[in-house]
């Protein structure tokens, strides 16, 4: 495993384990699978694990795994808490206490303000005494380092970076988002200030790997160097010295093994100009077929009308990339236990939680127009009858 330094000289594995996407059964994390994958990663040098207060069951799962295997003091835990919940420092203390209890630890290595969307959020936190709170937690050793996660444009990101002496930050960044979100501009700005940058969504929620349009597959196949789409995405990130840790939401043994291999092999500055040009072409091919830039994080769920929002958008993108029949099949599958997109009542609850700022109501309406054909409606009607029995 390769390592890069944080602000204080600690060695962090370039591959971090994102703990949001553990496999679940009936809404509960499959703990045996999660433990096997976490320990495989740990035994191969991964020492950075990312979770959050709002990831159902995640903090408790890794807390149990680390305690059972006696590795808490050999890893770094990064967890997050939404600023919306931070009304007073007393409430914040209570929530932090719950996180420590779940994680079965007396300290958190990296504490992030989750989805800090605007400088106004930080200004509000200052009015409740957040800077003094940070100083107190740092002095007591309860929290070692502070940062924030961000989804949004680069200009606002730079304002937040400049507003405080942060220890680190977490941004969405990949070869499709090089000039969107915080982007390369934000990455470079943080790096110039000596602030380590952790990366989320390296595969854009799987969009850089799964159901690629044929044009993108052909570009990869014709390139002089052969790697899988996932390996190319990680190599593009590891190639950049400004990147400290790349998170991957791993939930299969194969994914863990492949990501470890790539993290061990890739060197800074390894990609050639031809490699970079090839990935730009791939990004263009994917973008030309993508109807909705959903990463499948499911922060928008649950929907009051039981619509599978991310599943609908995946089917909509599949329709655009691979044709109506492929989109139809995926849509039938994703609405098996859910209501169709046309059931949307336009409440807008989902849009307040979407980190990608997607106009979900508008896109659901557009998806319904092309996916809910007479054939689909007939199939859904039959399935609904059987569901009632």
Segments the model singles out, each with a brief description of its role:
Residues 1-75:
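N-terminal binding-site loop/beta-alpha segment at the start of enzyme catalytic domains
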Residues 5, 40, 46-47, 66, ...:
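Structured C-terminal cap/extension of enzyme domains
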Residues 13-17, 49-51, 75-79, 108-113, ...:
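Hydrophobic faces of well-ordered beta-strands that scaffold small-molecule active sites
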Residues 25-26, 39, 86-203, 211-217, ...:
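Glycine/proline-rich, positively charged
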Residues 53, 57, 117, 151-152, ...:
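Short beta->alpha linker loops
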Residues 58-62, 153-158, 256:
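Short, well-ordered alpha-helical microsegments
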Residues 60-79, 131-140, 192:
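Alpha-helix-loop-beta-strand connector modules within alpha/beta enzyme cores
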Residues 81-83, 371:
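Acidic, glycine-rich active-site loops and adjacent beta-strand->loop/helix elements
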């Amino acid at each position: 495993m390769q390592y890069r330094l944080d602000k204080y000289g600690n060695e962090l594995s370039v591959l971090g384990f994102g703990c949001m996407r553990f496999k679940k059964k009936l809404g509960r994390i499959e703990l045996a699978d999660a433990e096997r994958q976490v320990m495989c990663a740990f035994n191969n040098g991964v020492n950075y694990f990312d979770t959050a207060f709002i990831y159902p069951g995640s903090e408790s799962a890794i807390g149990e795994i680390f305690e059972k295997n006696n590795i808490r003091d050999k890893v770094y835990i990064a967890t997050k808490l939404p600023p919306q919940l931070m009304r007073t420092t007393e409430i914040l203390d209570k929530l932090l206490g719950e996180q420590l209890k779940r994680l079965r630890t007396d300290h958190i290595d990296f504490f992030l303000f989750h989805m800090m969307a605007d400088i106004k959020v930080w200004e509000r936190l200052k009015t409740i005494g957040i800077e003094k709170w940070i100083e107190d937690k740092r002095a007591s050793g309860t929290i070692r380092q502070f940062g924030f996660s961000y989804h949004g444009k680069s200009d606002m990101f730079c304002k937040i970076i400049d507003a405080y002496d942060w220890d680190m930050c977490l941004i969405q960044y990949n070869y499709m988002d090089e000039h969107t979100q915080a982007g390369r501009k934000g990455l470079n700005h943080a790096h110039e200030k000596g602030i380590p940058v952790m990366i989320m969504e390296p595969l854009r929620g799987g969009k850089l790997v799964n159901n690629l349009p044929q044009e993108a597959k052909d570009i990869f196949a014709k390139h002089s160097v052969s790697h899988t789409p996932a390996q190319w995405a990680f190599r593009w990130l590891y190639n950049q010295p400004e990147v400290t840790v790349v998170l991957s939401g791993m939930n299969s043994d194969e994914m863990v093994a492949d990501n470890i291999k790539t993290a061990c092999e890739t060197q800074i500055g390894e990609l050639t100009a031809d490699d970079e040009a090839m990935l730009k072409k791939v990004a263009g091919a994917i973008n030309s077929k993508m109807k909705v830039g959903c990463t499948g994080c499911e922060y928008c769920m649950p929907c009051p009308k039981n619509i599978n929002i991310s599943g609908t958008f995946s089917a909509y993108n599949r329709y655009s990339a691979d044709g109506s029949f492929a989109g139809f099949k995926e849509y039938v599958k994703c609405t098996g236990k859910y209501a169709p997109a046309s059931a949307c009542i336009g409440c807008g609850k989902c849009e307040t939680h979407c980190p990608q700022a997607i106009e979900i109501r508008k896109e659901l309406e557009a998806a319904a127009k092309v996916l809910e054909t007479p054939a689909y409606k007939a199939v859904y009607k039959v399935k609904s009858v059987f569901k009632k029995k």
